[in-house]
Amino acid sequence: LAITLLAGLLLLAALVWTPAGNAVGKRIYDQLSIWIGFQASPDVVLVAIDERTRLALGGWPISRRHFATLMERLLQEDQAPRALGLDLLFTNTVPADEPLAEQMARLPVVLPKVMSQPLPLMQAPSAGQAWQWTPPALERAARGSGHIHVRFESDGIIRGVQTRLADQAHFSIAMLEVRTR
């Protein structure tokens, strides 16, 4: 029994402290994540634009009228989510901001934030670090915002996020906070 226990501890140490073991541990974690799965909440909606949709809507920039119409439909069909994340960066002011802001104010919208200047690797931002500008009408209409910075691991997979960056929670946490208000 002692030999089996010792062998198990040595194997665990190898998985934790060696590069090869770390790679095996990551694969185990990835596989367990797939097997366990994830059940999305039906009252949380994430709006993102895929390539097919981008082309169907005429390419970039996509008119903000489309997003306002989507929000109007969600309200008309009694399908208003408890959190609506717009995974889109709005970095300039356009005349369609006001109609979009009106629809946003009727829903629990969360906007993403990115740093205006990239940070050197491993450097933590300071409080008040400059975030990329968002049109004021949209900023006021949103119920929350969160950063969308991620760090890919050496194998190209994201296995975690920084829960807080300067004064911003991560986008997913901001959506959860808005959902539970």
Listing of model-derived features with the role each one plays in the protein:
Residues 1-181:
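Non-transmembrane functional regions of envelope-associated proteins
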